[in-house]
Regions:
Chain A
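N-terminal Sec/SRP start-transfer signal
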Residues: 1-34, 44, 53, 388-391
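Hydrophobic alpha-helical transmembrane segments of multi-pass inner-membrane transport and secretion
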Residues: 16-41, 245-282, 303-316, 361-368
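Alpha-helical transmembrane segments
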Residues: 31-61, 321-328
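Membrane-proximal extracellular/periplasmic loop immediately following the first transmembrane helix
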Residues: 49-101, 114
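Hydrophobic secondary-structure segments that place a key small or acidic residue at a functional site
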Residues: 97-100, 111-119, 130-197
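Short helix-loop junctions at transmembrane helix boundaries
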Residues: 311-358, 371
Length: 391, 232
């Protein structure tokens, strides 16, 4: 094997441009695949981190009727906060929020919103709720930058909101925008307006009630509480996993095409080599190689393209991948319209496992592709090979 | 000098399929070669000389009869056994040199020693010695495309001789060379034959080579027509 590697290396280096063209194509596959996989891992990591920071914290209790995908359930999705959680709420380890369905009237237009009551002093979410802790002539409210753009509302603007209280009566009031935040989690921004929790409870006549209770720290397990259902972070980020999985499948097709192109070049080189190097094959046999050993040599030679490609990838790919990890990849589309937590700039994350598995897969595929045409050598007649007479 | 029998061929027949029929290249050959012989299979194209050389070189097997080389029956050798025989005991010289084009002179000559697992220091010493025999010590870094035909064939001789094999099989070694280079090559081979007691077996129809042979076996249509031993 050592000899095969030594000879294969000599043969590859000696083959010059042909080798380097294959190596460059293959190294391109290495870099692109690692980069794209890194983007997916980075996206997954960033999406989950953003969701934890902005929306789900370390897990939540949902009032049992709450369904974020059905706004009609909101009128029934509230209950008194269980007494057993009072201490944690007082310590700031749990943040209660109340969500009700409402309507907003910016510049005379009407738009449905979810009105979220939030404690202005909470510190679990990155929401700038301290901007709700202000004295104004109207109720202070904060909105996300996408909502601000869609509703054409800026800081200092007054706008009417309307809601239906627990008695089924419609009521309306004015809010003033005291803050606009920028956030990568669309469900935190789009269609939501945040006002002080106590104010909303007052408006709804729902004293001491909440829809969601969010923990600061990741909770492995919480006791069952009647009327509330516990959701851990894995459950709450399941949609991210599913979407990433869907994207990964799509990307795998792209990897396959990339690899296929690189493998086609290797396969073609192997077929051509075996045809053009018949005399050399015959010579190896005459000098004491068995045909099997020559098959091994040609397979190692083909597979070595991937080793050289990994080295070449490291030379030009490493600085590129490091640069991408630092400066990120700015999405060519408006990230807020993507439907899931996604930053405008994604920062790829490369783990050792990702790099090693990609290298191993490519080396393995290259070896198989190199072996495939080399099997022909095992059927060669060495006396004809020596004269280069095989067709 | 030629006393111990190292190649023994008995009733050797070799046939090749040709469509639905068979072509018999060798028809019941009986020959014996001793150690240190400088012999040649002589004959026109199609006489069976290369076929016989290939069988002696364990690159091919007889259809019937027996070819024993250094005590090993070629017909019953496994692929590994035949490869071992070639690797350890046989050297080959080809008409078109068959040098490894991407390897330099040193690496080409070193190749058989790599297979025999000599150390780097041993290989270097042996390669330089072999290149000294053929007068190419100044070309170690050159690659075959940078060499003349004569130089290529001298590299091929050095490669065949570097491991000091018992038998060197040379198939039309001067066919691609001019007269001056042919004589130069042949003189080198004669010198090595005399100094190292290596048996040389040629397949040739080149007069220049025939004149150097001490034993000439004339083949005609797969049969031994004449077996001449020179007295000089």
């Amino acid at each position: 094997m050592k000899l095969a590697i030594k000879l294969a290396y000599r043969n590859l280096i000696g083959a010059g441009l042909r080798t380097w063209l294959n190596v460059i194509v293959l190294s391109f596959s290495f870099v692109v695949i690692i980069w794209m996989k890194g983007i997916m891992v980075g996206w997954d990591h960033q999406a989950k981190t953003d969701m934890k920071n902005w929306e789900i914290g370390g897990g939540q209790y949902w009032q049992e009727n709450y369904d974020p995908f059905d706004p009609f359930t909101l009128s029934e999705s509230h209950a008194a906060i269980p007494v057993s959680l009072n201490d944690e709420i007082t310590n700031g380890e749990i943040v209660p929020s109340l969500i009700v369905s409402g309507t907003i009237y910016p510049q005379g237009r009407m738009q449905s919103v979810a009105i979220v009551g939030m404690n202005p002093h909470q510190s679990i979410f990155m929401l700038p709720t301290e901007k709700l802790d202000t004295t104004t002539s109207a109720i202070p409210a904060i909105i996300g930058s996408v909502s601000s753009r869609n509703l054409k509302l800026n800081v200092g603007d007054y706008v009417t909101i309307r809601w239906r209280n627990v008695n089924g009566m419609f009521d309306a009031t004015e809010v003033v925008i005291t803050g606009i935040f920028s956030c990568n989690v669309p469900s935190v921004d789009v269609g939501k307006i945040y006002i002080p929790l106590e104010k909303l409870r007052e408006m709804m006549s729902l004293k001491g009630e909440a829809t969601i209770l969010t923990f600061r720290e990741e909770q492995s397990e919480r006791p069952e509480i009647t009327g509330w259902s516990y959701k851990n972070t894995a459950t709450l980020t399941q949609s991210v996993d599913e979407l990433i999985q869907t994207k990964t499948v799509g990307q795998s097709i792209f990897y396959a095409i990339l690899l296929l192109l690189a493998m086609l070049a290797i396969f073609d080189t192997q077929v051509l080599s075996i045809f053009r190097r018949q005399k050399e094959i015959g010579t190896y046999i005459a000098l004491g190689y068995t045909r099997r050993e020559v098959v091994g040599l040609f397979t190692v030679e083909g597979a070595m393209h991937s080793i050289l490609a990994a080295i070449v990838s490291a030379i030009y790919g490493l600085p590129f991948l490091i640069w991408m990890a630092k400066s990120g990849w700015t999405m060519p589309i408006e990230a807020s319209e993507f439907g899931m937590a996604m930053a405008q700039t994604l920062y790829p994350v490369y783990s050792a496992g990702l790099v090693i598995s990609t290298v191993l897969i490519i080396v393995l595929v290259t070896t198989v592709v190199s072996y495939w045409p080399s099997r022909k050598i095992a059927k060669m007649n060495p006396t004809e090979a020596l004269r280069g007479k095989l067709q | 000098m030629e006393n111990t029998s190292i190649i023994k061929i008995e009733h050797l027949t070799k046939s090749f399929p040709m469509g639905k029929s068979k072509f018999t290249a060798l028809k019941g050959i009986n020959l014996t070669f001793g150690e240190g012989e400088f012999a040649g299979l002589v004959g026109p194209s199609g006489s069976g000389k290369t076929t016989l050389l290939n069988i002696v070189g364990s690159l091919d097997v007889p259809s019937s009869g027996e070819a024993k080389v250094l005590g090993e029956s070629i017909g019953s050798l496994t692929a590994k056994g035949a490869a071992r025989l070639r690797k350890e005991k046989l050297g080959f010289i080809f008409q078109s040199y068959n040098l490894l084009a991407v390897h330099n002179v040193f690496e080409n000559v070193e190749f058989p020693l790599l297979l025999l697992k000599y150390t780097a220091a041993e290989r270097k010493k042996m390669v330089m010695e072999a290149l000294d025999w053929v007068g190419l010590t100044d070309k170690v870094k050159s690659k075959p495309p940078q060499l003349s035909g004569g130089e290529c064939q001298r590299v091929a001789i050095a490669r065949a001789m570097v491991k000091k094999p018992s038998i060197v099989l040379a198939d039309e070694p001067t066919a691609n060379l001019d007269a001056a280079n042919s004589h130069n090559i042949l003189q080198t081979m004669v010198k090595l034959n005399e100094e190292l007691k290596t048996t040389f077996l040629f397949a040739t129809h080149d007069e220049k080579v025939i004149n150097y042979l001490r034993r000439k076996i004339f083949l005609k249509d797969g049969n031994v027509d004449q077996d001449e031993i020179s007295t000089n």
